Structure formats: C-alpha cells, structure tokens
Amino acid sequence: MTSVLGVYQYYGMSRISSSDLKPKSELLPWDRPFAGRYSGWATTVSHYSGVLAVAPLALAGYSWYKGDADGHDFGAFTLMFVEAVALQNALNQLVRSSQLWSRPFVYSERGEGRRKAESARGEAYGSFYSGHASAAFTVAVFTGEWFSEIYPNSQYKSLVWASSLTLAAAVGALRVVAGKHYPTDVVVGSLMGTGVSLGILKLHEICKKNIAFWAFPGNIGAIFYF
C-alpha cells in the first residue's frame, strides 16, 4: 500500500513556475554552491549504476550454488531484499512528492542544463532526498550483511563491506556532479537506505526467533514466543 501511494504521489507532482521557485538564498548554505550545476555524462553513468542491484542476489545465488546456503536461505534473503528495495523506493517517492526544493539543474541559466530545466517534469522540483543514494546503500548494506552471515569467518568480509559502501558512495557523488541532487539529499538518502536495510533484516531476525508457523491439510497456525 505504501508503495502504491508513493508512486501515485510521485507521478502526481507538478511543475513549479519560475516565480514560485525557491530562491537560492533559501537553500541550505552548504547546498547553494551546487545550484545550477548539470552534467550529462554523470547523469548517464549514475543511471547505469542500477546494475549494482543484482549484487546481493548474485551473491546469494552463488552461495546457494556452492552449498554454503540452501534454497530456504536464498528465498528468505530474496524476499527481504525485495521488501527493502520496495520500502525505500516508496518512502523516497512520498518524501520527494512534498517538493521541498528543486533539483540543482533547475537553477541552470545557460547551456544544456538550461534546456533540461525548461523541459523538466514535475519530479524535478522534488530533489529531497536522493532515491539513487537510498537504493545504492540499501544494496550495499544487504550485500555486506548477507556475506557476513554466510561467511562469518571469511577474510574477505572487510573487502566486501568496503567495496559495497564505496560503490554506493560513488553513486551518491555522481548524483551531485550530475546536478540531480544536493549533498544534503545524498547524505539523507544514504542514511535512509542504510536504515531500511538494517530495519528489514532486524525485523525478520525477530520474527524468525519469536514466530513459528505450521501448515498441514485442514490446519494452519502460528506460535508467538514472548
């Protein structure tokens, strides 16, 4: 339901006239220098970063193939990952639909940035917070947590965590360079993605310990442990 509402709100966003555009002086002090920025190549590269989303599932599939995890583990992990991605996306769209401030490129006064601003859709006027950064850190944290759970004694744990978080941070940086988001958008997006991942993982951990389900012909039920 949250996802549906988020999508509805997101695509219902309307353009803001230049006279109603928030003045640069009202942006956060550390964000103002980025108003008017636009980069086509950074926009393209940041969009392709979506391929990183397969990393957690690829890792889970590899673990299953190698026998380090079973089909139940793979299914549970996939379910949690889908839940986390859907939740972070819905939350992002709900917040962005408030149109707290516009994307940096909307303030462009010349060149390609100006042309993009003139043809921008309503979503361009809701920059806060970065969905790309949120998604990237959701993926990064899930990858690190899954690897740590399946291979708790691996010498590569630190490398996996460092690589995942570095790639996620790079996605956020590209969104700033592209003129799609301000530093504040990226920082908050990173925290939201991390929080959603850890929250979903913790919730399933609690449910796994405190709830037992059974099902057989003519009967289905659950036991809650307190």
Regions found by a protein language model. Name each.
Residues 1-59, 96-115:
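N-terminal transmembrane-helix/juxtamembrane module of multi-pass inner/ER membrane proteins
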Residues 5, 9, 87-92, 96, ...:
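Alpha-helical transmembrane segments of multipass membrane proteins
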Residues 34-44, 70-73, 123, 152-155:
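Juxtamembrane loop-transmembrane helix junctions in multi-pass integral membrane proteins
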Residues 35-52, 79-85, 117, 198-201, ...:
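Hydrophobic, membrane-inserting alpha-helical segments
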Residues 57, 81-89, 165, 190, ...:
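Alpha-helical transmembrane spans of integral membrane proteins, capturing the lipid-embedded, hydrophobic core
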Residues 59-66, 92-100, 144, 148, ...:
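Membrane-water interface at transmembrane helix exits
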Residues 66-91, 161:
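Interfacial segments of alpha-helical transmembrane regions
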Residues 110-225:
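Membrane-embedded catalytic cores of phosphoryl/pyrophosphoryl-handling enzymes
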